[in-house]
Amino acid sequence: MRPSSNLVAASAAALVSSASLAQNANDRVSFEPFFEAGQSMRYVLDLDATIKQKEGEQRAFNQRVDQTITLDFEVVAVDDRGAVIDAKIIGLNLGAMWGDRMYAYEWPRLTTDVPLRLPPIVILEKMGEATRDARVKVRVDRSVDGEPGRVVVSGFEDIAETLEGQDVFDMTVLGLLANEQIADALTGAFFVEGASGKQIRKGAGWQTEDRVNLGPAGAMDIATSWVFASLEQGVATVRGTPRATIARPASADPASPSARLEAQESSIEVKWNVDLGRADSRVSKQAMTTVWTLGPLTLSQEQDTTLSVTRKN
């Protein structure tokens, strides 16, 4: 996310072209990001994730993370690969479950109430203060030769250290507060999977595939069916329907855990601003129940997650 304040002429021309010609008379759209040095933008990232785990007949263990992060961005350089962007956190709401109750940290604080100095409040405050101090850099590399574009983020490396020496929360409470998680969220603001570097006609569909490693239990393969659903007033709506399957290792060890999907429902909707060359919004929803088995032990995990990325004027 670093370098060059020099504008490469050929690259700039290509980027300007991709914005001005992003939509043509045949209702084709190029889902490519467009950047100019000095551009500013604001995005709000919102995560609401609930996990319910139950082992056998034992009482269920519930976790919930509810976060809202508001970031101001300024494009500081454009080069032949993409853009270098400075980001500043201007708003932060961190919520997490401890026991059966939600606790929260808010900045700037909109209420005058002083929260009790309970352990979860203290930890959330440490997380929040470390996040506010983060010097965030973003590098956006556009699609080249058919390779998908990517986003790389730095600045959140120290947030996890605030969880050391405590036994209230596990790492799940970090939610979005990690370089990789912020990068994944912003990828949805600047790219549409499987559409980078292509002119796509309204009504067209395509498919993307991804794999998540599950260790000795195998892998989760996710196939997403996409469709360019509509184009109205310069905003293209793209919808995705992910479907997951679990692939067991070819030679699975009987002593290793196994997993199966019991239920799933997922959806993605992107509102792409053709003139700006980035998403006005992206909402991803996933509800999934996974059953893990190891010998006589069975663990059921229900996960319900909504991640939204919204551009603000």
Model-derived regions, located:
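Bacterial N-terminal signal peptides that target proteins for export
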Residues: 1-11
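Signature of exported/secreted
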Residues: 23-313
